[in-house]
């Protein structure tokens, strides 16, 4: 397991860096929180409705000295305020993992205006607002955005989701260039199939994985390692790491109905 830069086993709590993970209470987000905590970070766990899971994870990570919980509905605005609140918890904020997302499989003609707004709000606008608020502090730090291997393709059946993720990919590069003089690094990870979408079976996911060039799903442990690498490597910015078993190399739609969340 990588260790946060400047942190060793004898460091005091005040010396430990702090990371905010959106959608951190469950599934992939919870795994990222565990990995960051194990590498020396104190973690601010953001949740929307998963309050019990977030509190349970907080206890698992060592209690209030090592982890905190903040609740917010990113579809209703206020993402910038979440950054300010996270910094106040431990008196510092060193990095953000934009993991929270919504997913619906609807085409451009089928998706309603309200559904499109929600997709854009949660998957693009909220992460961007958080990044911008983080940069406005004028302090060095890092940001890792969770994307999707399909940003390199055109899957017209999940239009709102993909429009938002493609926008976040472009924002990753633009913000990395713009904020480099501030010492802020902005990177992203684009995973393939990590977990079945809730309600879907492992068999359904396995059939999708068989269509990928490497024919393997993305282990959540590898995803966590990639996030830690981008968080702790000071010379990397504006990079998108594809952990998708080659999905981004395929130009045709493979009929995916499962995502990492």
Language-model features and meaning:
Residues 41-55:
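Conserved glycine-rich Rossmann-like NAD(P)H-binding loop of the short-chain dehydrogenase/reductase
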Residues 94, 169, 179-194, 236-243:
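Conserved Rossmann-fold SDR core element
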């Amino acid at each position: 397991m990588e260790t946060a830069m400047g942190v060793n086993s004898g460091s005091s709590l005040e010396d430990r860096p702090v990371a905010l993970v959106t959608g951190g209470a469950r599934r992939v987000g919870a795994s990222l929180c565990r990995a960051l905590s194990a590498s020396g970070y104190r973690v601010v766990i953001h949740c929307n409705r998963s309050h019990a899971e977030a509190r349970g994870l907080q206890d698992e990570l060592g209690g209030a000295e090592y982890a905190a919980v903040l609740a917010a509905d990113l579809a209703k605005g206020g993402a910038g305020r979440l950054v300010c609140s996270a910094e106040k918890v431990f008196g510092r904020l060193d990095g953000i993992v934009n993991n929270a997302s919504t997913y619906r499989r609807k085409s451009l003609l089928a998706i309603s205006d309200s559904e499109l707004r929600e997709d854009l709000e949660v998957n693009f606008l909220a992460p961007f607002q958080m990044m911008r608020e983080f940069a406005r502090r004028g302090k060095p730090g890092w940001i890792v955005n969770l994307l999707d291997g399909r940003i390199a393709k055109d899957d017209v059946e999940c239009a709102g989701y993909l429009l938002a993720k493609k926008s976040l990919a472009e924002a990753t590069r633009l913000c990395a260039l713009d904020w480099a003089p501030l010492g802020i690094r902005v990177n992203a990870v684009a995973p393939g199939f990590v977990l079945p979408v809730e309600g879907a079976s492992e068999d359904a996911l396995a059939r999708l994985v068989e269509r990928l060039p490497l024919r393997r799903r993305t282990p959540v442990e590898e995803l966590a390692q990639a996030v830690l690498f981008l968080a702790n490597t000071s010379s990397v910015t504006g990079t998108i790491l594809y952990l998708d078993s080659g999905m981004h190399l395929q130009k045709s739609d493979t009929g995916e109905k499962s995502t990492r969340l």
